[in-house]
Regions:
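Short, low-complexity disordered leader/linker segments with a strong preference
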Residues: 1-33
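A residue-level marker of the well-folded mature domains of exported/periplasmic proteins
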Residues: 26-214
């Protein structure tokens, strides 16, 4: 599943470079042309952030452009604050980013607030759509591309395949508390149970209470 997500990220980034943001004028080499900001999780989490980062690396190295990531500090409730998200977007722009990858719906409001201020920067928001704080009405901004995956379906397939591969003691650990992580976890449990019912075998499931939200 991680490799599949990485492939999707590579394809999305390549698509962006080829047509979505075509016509951008060339500029001097930025400090870091492509910047990914995580949702607070690290890029070796074995989950969503790592998949996204692998995709960013693969594309950037093939294209021969500079890249890096930032891992913001989350609050005590394991969530990334709006203020922190916006500070890291400002930092990325200050460091010369031309493309900012945001692999989580926790950036929806931050992108809504910041993207119009940096119209020469291209934003890629994964599993989210920009909207104002306190208002879920989607906004469409010229320099923002939104890429959505069905997290529930992806989790279901992963759980189903895990049991079909012979695993009967399973666990799920989300990177941080978020809607996407929760949906993926819920799908994982459902897929594992569906496969267990088909095979007629018992399957146990453990999870981290602080992270997984059902």
């Amino acid at each position: 599943m991680k490799r599949i997500l990485s492939a999707f990220m590579c394809a999305a980034l390549i698509a962006v470079s080829l047509f979505a943001f075509a016509g951008c004028s060339k500029s001097e080499q930025a400090d870091y042309k492509i910047v990914m900001i995580t949702d607070g999780g690290n890029v070796a989490d074995g989950a969503y952030n790592q998949s996204a980062w692998n995709g960013v690396k693969a594309f950037a190295e093939e294209a021969g452009v500079s890249y890096r990531y930032y891992q913001p500090k989350v609050q005590e409730n394991e969530k990334l604050s709006l203020e922190t998200a916006e500070q890291y977007i400002d930092l990325a722009v200050k460091k010369g980013a031309e493309y900012i990858i945001l692999p989580s719906d926790v950036f929806e409001v931050a992108v809504y607030d910041k993207a119009p201020l940096y119209n020469n920067v291209k934003f890629i928001l994964v599993d989210g759509t920009p909207h104002p704080q306190g208002d879920d009405t989607d906004a469409y901004i010229d320099n923002v591309m939104c890429i959505s995956f069905n997290s529930l379906q992806s989790g279901f397939i992963a759980g189903y395949e895990a049991v079909l591969s012979g695993n009967t003691k399973l666990g799920y650990l989300g990177s941080v508390k978020s809607k996407t992580s929760s949906l993926y976890g819920a799908g994982f449990v459902q897929g594992a149970q569906y496969a267990a019912d088909q095979l007629g075998i018992p399957v146990s499931m453990d999870y981290a209470d602080m992270i997984l939200l059902f």
